[in-house]
Amino acid sequence: MSRFSGALQLTDLDDFITPSQECIKPVTVDKTATSKTGAKITVQEDGYYEESESGKQKLQKVEITLQDCLACSGCITSAESVLITQQSEEELLKVLRENAKVKATGDMEQVRTIVFTIATQPLLSLAHRYQLSAEETARHLAGYFRSLGVDYVLCTKVADDLALLECQQEFVERYRDNEELTMLSSSCPGWVCYAEKTHGNFILPYIATTRSPQQIMGVLVKQFLAEKLNIPGSRIYHVTVMPCYDKKLEASRMDFYSEVNESRDVDCVITSVEVEQMLNEDERSLSEHEASDLDWPWSEQRPESMVWSHEATLSGGYAEHIFKFAAKELFNEAPPTELSFKQLRNRDFREISLEKDDKTVLKFAIANGFRNIQNLVQKLKRGKGASYHFVEVMACPSGCINGGAQVRPTTGQHVRELTQQLEELYKKLPRSQPDNAHTKLIYRDFLDGSHTDKSNELLHTSYHAVEKLSTALNIKW
């Protein structure tokens, strides 16, 4: 059974994305005198499609690539990951086996350096699953991955920090240029793909250009780490462990393909539930694998911990961190350490504001889940959403901690109960301060400083409105 997400149904607006095997990607078929119009084309699991009206007639094999998915406006989110073949544990294990064979021949020029990057949310999901602490989980995962032939196992801390630093500066610059224009976060690929496909040129100017931590990590691994190892970036196979399937599509965007290295910044994305599946197939619990320290190649001094939180929110802390920075930078105000967001319609839509001289000078919000996202977009279209200066937007209810590819609840356990338990684990983590010695070193030694042409090129991206299909009436909702 496929473990990829599927088409978003209207009844799923506040729940996990579920699998589907249908795709409306138009395929050119030679017409014959007996051909009928209006037939539905269904992609089958074995790689061919069938025309449903005239019976199960085997047609020419069709291949749908990730680029087809990204260029297709048929699905309203990036849930087309059901079609992904190069972003799976099977593909990963194949690469690891082939690399081991090359090593055995002694042809070291052809050996690839395998690098794993693990995000915080999957660590917490797997920690809960195997009843370990976050740090213990990180160390046992490092040992397990190394037993498979992985060379380096990293955390996302430095990329998380850089994403926050870039996003906070981007917000301040935008505010000074045009304080009326709402800025929307950009780290959630499900939200970005939905925006490109459904609202296009209207919504894209609102979205921050700062890359997600996954893609910042891709640049650091394929360029900065490659320089340190004195190998071309194309010799590195970079794998990330993420909480949602949409990260697979994000890694496959052509915006994140390096012409210099002739490779993607992130070659493969696997998810929490796929790691669990790999461990199940190994028939050993995570704690049974030898523990090993994570690598820290960015500076000589290692941080005291490898698993960090970023403010109190569970999706990177964008709203809280940027609010505090902007209050100080723009208005010389120092908000309290712990911010108090006001809940609106539900726990997934909250807001906070800063008052100065009887005027609201900053108004931020957090909008999780597609129901709240749709309400937000409609407000923007009606001109009412402009009251927000910044909105942290995440496609999944409760944010990344409840990503669609996190380990599933046990029998009898509700999703919200599991999410609350993961939230408690997150709150116990040490809190990272992004402006630290490690990020300063990367700005100095790799990016030629902050706000430079190189940092703008490598830490920011662009978006593309997807043209609507002429066959839009055939979309299955």
From Swiss-Prot:
GO biological-process terms attached to the record: iron-sulfur cluster assembly
Keyword Cytoplasm: no
Alphabetized UniProt keyword annotations: 4Fe-4S, Iron, Iron-sulfur, Metal-binding
Coiled coil regions, renumbered to chain: none
Pfam families, per database record: Fe_hyd_lg_C, Fe_hyd_SSU
Taxonomy, superkingdom: Eukaryota
Binding site for [4Fe-4S] cluster 2: 188, 244, 396, 400
Binding site for [4Fe-4S] cluster 1: 23, 69, 72, 75
GO molecular function: 4 iron, 4 sulfur cluster binding; metal ion binding
UniProt record similarity statement: Belongs to the NARF family.
Function: Component of the cytosolic iron-sulfur (Fe/S) protein assembly machinery. Required for maturation of extramitochondrial Fe/S proteins.
Protein name: Probable cytosolic Fe-S cluster assembly factor GL21135
Natural source organism: Drosophila persimilis (Fruit fly)
